[in-house]
Amino acid sequence: MPSSWGKIFKVGTFGESHGKSVGVIVEGVPAGIPIRLEEIQKDLDRRRPGQSNLTTPRDENDTVRVVSGVFEGKTIGSPIALVVENQNTNSKDYENLRTTYRPSHADYTYQMKYGFRAHVGGGRSSVRETIGRVAAAAIARMILKDDLGIETVAWVDSIGTIQSTIGEKYPKSREEVDQNEVRCPDAVSADQMRSLILKMKEAGDSVGGTIKCVSYNLPPGLGDPVYDKLDGDLAKAILSIPACKGFEVGSGFSGTLLTGSSHNDEFYVEGGTGKVRTKTNNSGGLQGGISNGEELVIRAAFKPTSTIFKKQNTINLKGEETTLEAKGRHDPCVLPRAVPIIEAVVNLVLVDAYLYQRAINPQWFQKWARIPDYYKDLEL
């Protein structure tokens, strides 16, 4: 079962929903980087369950522990192991899933592929796998911010038929997004979304939606042509998130409604800075699979949570038709907790692209990167 990703900044996650622990091994992190444990914990706190009555009531502290790769608060170049203990499992609620498949869940496909599965909590298909990715991405975020000034901010753009009305007035910080529990910067829409989620929760049902994400201060040159396009890497990473079913960059599918003359992003030279800019950003910051220096703009679609508390038709292990009323603790809508997960996988893709570009083109690094003091402190 593949569980690793990355060319330079390599991430390998481990653990299941109801196992003893979940975590991640991170390779390729340069030595000498200060690891701010409180920043990693802050990111994990944003994705943890039990944050509000909009999320699953499973109450986990998700306290991270650094097992290796860090000495006196700094990376030493060896693999970094980050571990979070599972403390609030309730496996008896899943006993009926030992022999019965949840519709639209990974239960059936895992059974068909492997012939055996961990039925409690969804096992490896659980969103708790993303704890490792969020923890690793906190390190990635530190590197991107310190070296390039890159900031990635995601938010809930829609839930059900309720659409945020902020347009291209994108939030500049995660603090703006976190002002409400829905994580939608449009306060009016957020209230409507909250009511819809609670309505679905009361009905034992679920609802999906979309998340938008912007990365600021990307330099031109990240990503590679053809098979290693940055948008291709982003698509694979984002679609690997549980419940994510759609992805677009820039104008995305709506761009098909435009003509070339209205869709093309015309270049100009910015007065005062001399920077090459584009008048519009329908490309979403990517052209030919490579960043062009504009904001990276993506959107991801999440289906309604598959585990619901309504009676549904399904089959059992014997292939017999039956019905299922699910138990356990589940999110009526994954969107509020998926926001930090989207930010995480975007940062993982970007840091891998950055470290690769830095390795193959030192002149690019000298031109675009800021050299933090901790690199200068290395005794070589």
Curated annotation (Swiss-Prot):
Reactions catalysed according to its record: 5-O-(1-carboxyvinyl)-3-phosphoshikimate = chorismate + phosphate
PROSITE patterns: CHORISMATE_SYNTHASE_1 (PS00787), CHORISMATE_SYNTHASE_3 (PS00789)
UniProt-listed CDD domains: Chorismate_synthase
Residues binding FMN: R124, S125, S126, G288, K303, P304, T305, S306, T307, R329
Cofactor note: Reduced FMN (FMNH(2)).
InterPro entries the UniProt entry points to: Chorismate_synth (IPR000453), Chorismate_synth_AroC_sf (IPR035904), Chorismate_synthase_CS (IPR020541)
Entry binding sites for NADP(+): R47
Pathway(s): Metabolic intermediate biosynthesis; chorismate biosynthesis; chorismate from D-erythrose 4-phosphate and phosphoenolpyruvate: step 7/7
Cofactor(s) of this protein: FMNH2
UniProt xrefs under HAMAP family: Chorismate_synth (MF_00300)
Family: Belongs to the chorismate synthase family.
Function field: This reaction introduces a second double bond into the aromatic ring system.
Name of this chain's protein: Chorismate synthase
Organism: Leptospira borgpetersenii serovar Hardjo-bovis (strain JB197)
Gene: aroC
